[in-house]
């Protein structure tokens, strides 16, 4: 088997995790108590869904996941929620005091005490796997736990499981909406370790997803539940091919191979289509070309940055439902002729496609309509640098005055780490600039094309 272990860190990671596991259970017909009425081969571990669930002798399906937070309230909601019987109590790890939005607390003082327990639980899950493929790590980098403990866990996983892939689903601070004053510090400090210790990181930001909920689903005031259900659709689409058998399956390591041209250039944009409410879906015919066009729309991006400002290096299209390769090829050919979707000149093909015949599921009573086919795109675009430059700018404004720095130093961090992390990000922005400009010497004659 090619198992995958999910690690959910901090409030954001856990709440996204709840949405994901709710959706996985729905897709596989697993009840909230872990039983699976449709599973005839109880205890036989070669079903495709065993990548994400392990089976006990009594036929209970347990997610291969751990949830970690430095304070108990969010995890207590899982312990008392409707899926409380799904998880083994040891998979839910909570501390007593939180990281107080402070990277240094999550990484040095408070996080240090809990990290060995987490790794111990991960080890138990890993020992239960026959061929562990890698880790999915869910966290936000604005807070203290997601950024600090998230970085610490990634660093330790690199030591313990050096060769396994690590995919991060990372919620970045939004341009306008902020939940903490020190978000820029935490983000810069933890991006520093995301750079080194993840193989692919998918950037998400709440503001972009709010806008999608407002615009496409007509939800006036989206809640985190609305956002997380949308995020879970993306993550589900990415992992469909690991959990079901399909026509063109895409493995986690394949994502890496196809999306990451240089090791540092591994921050991805994601988009999903169709995001549509049930009332509208009734009147619209959503064909393969239509949904394919939709995922390239700047307004579909799940992070606030404009792909038209950059160039695509690669993109991965994961279709699910009633889709045949012929339609996909035609849709992709049309996209290639568009002036708005520009690829770097050193990567002429740039498309990796996957198809899975399992139609998308939606949570009953949720906002999304049940549709016949959907597509999720993960793309590597140089415009992602906008996200970093925005955060860097805010970081600089605060750090010039050394504002709030004493809270970090007081928890055992050294001031040098700030400048080191900031320089690393400056280098990253530069890397993106260069990747987008490669082959720029022959661009002088482009004006005559029109």
Curated annotation (Swiss-Prot):
Catalytic activity reads: GTP + H2O = GDP + phosphate + H(+)
Q: What is this protein's name? A: Tubulin alpha-3 chain
> What does the subunit section of this Swiss-Prot or TrEMBL entry state?
Dimer of alpha and beta chains. A typical microtubule is a hollow water-filled tube with an outer diameter of 25 nm and an inner diameter of 15 nM. Alpha-beta heterodimers associate head-to-tail to form protofilaments running lengthwise along the microtubule wall with the beta-tubulin subunit facing the microtubule plus end conferring a structural polarity. Microtubules usually have 13 protofilaments but different protofilament numbers can be found in some organisms and specialized cells.
Annotated residues that bind Mg(2+) are located at 71
Give a GO molecular function annotation for the protein: metal ion binding
Q: Where in the cell is it found?
A: Cytoplasm, Cytoskeleton
* This protein's encoding gene: TUBA3
Q: Which UniProt keywords apply?
A: Cytoplasm, Cytoskeleton, GTP-binding, Hydrolase, Magnesium, Metal-binding, Microtubule, Nucleotide-binding
Alphabetical list of PANTHER family matching this protein: TUBULIN (PTHR11588)
Q: Which cofactor does it need?
A: Mg(2+)
């Amino acid at each position: 088997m090619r198992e995958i272990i999910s690690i959910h860190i901090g409030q954001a990671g856990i709440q996204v995790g709840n949405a994901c596991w709710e959706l996985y259970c729905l897709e596989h017909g697993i009840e909230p108590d872990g039983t699976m009425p449709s599973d005839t081969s109880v205890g036989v571990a070669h079903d495709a869904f065993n990548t994400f669930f392990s089976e006990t002798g009594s036929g209970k399906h347990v997610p291969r996941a751990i949830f970690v937070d430095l304070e108990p309230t969010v995890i207590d909601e899982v312990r008392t929620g409707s899926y409380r019987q799904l998880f083994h109590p040891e998979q839910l790890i909570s501390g007593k005091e939180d990281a107080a939005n402070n990277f240094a607390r999550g990484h040095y003082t408070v996080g240090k005490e809990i990290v060995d327990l987490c790794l111990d639980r991960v080890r138990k899950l890993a020992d239960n796997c026959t061929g562990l493929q890698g880790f999915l790590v869910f966290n936000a980098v604005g807070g203290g736990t997601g950024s600090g403990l998230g970085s610490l866990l990634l660093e330790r996983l690199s030591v313990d499981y050096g060769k396994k892939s690590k995919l991060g689903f990372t919620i970045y601070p939004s341009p306008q909406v902020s939940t903490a004053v020190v978000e820029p510090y935490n983000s810069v400090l933890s991006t520093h370790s995301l750079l080194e210790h993840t193989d692919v990181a998918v950037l998400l930001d709440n503001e972009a997803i709010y806008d999608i909920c407002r615009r496409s689903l007509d939800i006036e005031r989206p809640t985190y539940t609305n956002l997380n259900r949308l995020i879970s659709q993306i993550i589900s689409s990415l992992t469909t091919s690991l959990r079901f058998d399909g026509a063109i399956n895409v493995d986690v390591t394949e994502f890496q191979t196809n999306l990451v041209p240089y090791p540092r250039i591994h921050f991805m944009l994601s988009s999903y289509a169709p995001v549509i409410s049930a009332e509208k879906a009734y009147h619209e015919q959503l064909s393969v070309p239509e949904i394919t066009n939709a995922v390239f729309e700047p307004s579909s991006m799940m992070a606030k940055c404009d792909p038209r400002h950059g160039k695509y290096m690669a993109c991965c299209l994961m279709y699910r439902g009633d889709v045949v390769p012929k339609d996909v090829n035609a849709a992709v050919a049309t996209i290639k002729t568009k002036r708005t979707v520009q690829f770097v000149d050193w990567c002429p093909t740039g498309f990796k496609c996957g198809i899975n015949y399992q139609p998308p599921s939606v949570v009953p009573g949720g906002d999304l309509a049940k549709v016949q086919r959907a597509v999720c795109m993960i793309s590597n675009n140089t415009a992602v640098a906008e996200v970093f430059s925005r955060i860097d700018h805010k970081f600089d404004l605060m750090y010039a005055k050394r504002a709030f720095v004493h809270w970090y130093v007081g928890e055992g961090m050294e001031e040098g780490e700030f400048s080191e992390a900031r320089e690393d990000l400056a280098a990253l922005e530069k890397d993106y600039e260069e990747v987008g400009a490669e082959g720029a010497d022959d661009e002088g004659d482009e004006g005559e094309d029109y």
